[in-house]
């Protein structure tokens, strides 16, 4: 009898130890290794009960924020869960959570190219970035930081909600050196936007992570690749909006009477890179002629970021292989509507959330 009790005690102790070790194995990764998907349910939804099976389900949840525009490029705010279909690598998925995300606090990374190649457009960069911050930031709710990059990235102003403070640092920037665009994106995601300041007071702990990249897109010094920069933005749920500083268009437009209408037909290689960065992460690329051309665009960006939908699902293929998965969201009954979202995500790898994809997601997509 005593021997049986002793064996039972040993068995229970081993079981408790195994359960604790298993729980620790499911803890989030360290700050320098951001998770690919937000493990928490979307705002306004109840989390699942704390059973071992459902804990695993929450960890594998894929959460996608997206914007819907009508034929006139106006926001569509009144759609319901039943209107949408979501596909993971072309496989239909069951939508587990659906919500409308409105008036979210913004956490903005303003990335300014200060390399020698944009010397003639530095004033444009300063004016464009300052105008954006004053147009979009709401003091007490939104915050932004400023990072410059030439030979290497450098944060010149940490997160603040004061647009005037941000402007004061922006106007001090000077141009010179090479261009490390991809390193700047990667560092901004990992070091700043992966763990941005939480909203003050009793506001819900949900923020929108945004990057505004102003550059000619011509990288020549980065240690990271474009695929790695996009991967990190997708892992940290960062949406990239790009603004081109290309001067080739300005020279061409002097003999083109349809200068603004034809801008996208004359994209430089750098412009195409900027477009790819934006589209892969659910943002937009802008190719302005003058700073004034951006005024309405900035207002549109602010409206988009504060009026979005959220869909979450558990992938039917939940193998932890670190592989890149394409996401497609459809509106079967609204064929003329546009859906703007990130194009995919990286599945967790068994024991390593930072496994690189077998194929870089830098090509074009058939997503709406």
Q: Where does each model-flagged region fall?
A:
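Bacterial N-terminal signal peptides that target proteins for export
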Residues: 1-11
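Bacterial N-terminal signal peptides
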Residues: 9-19
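Scaffold/interface architecture of coatomer-like assemblies
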Residues: 23-368
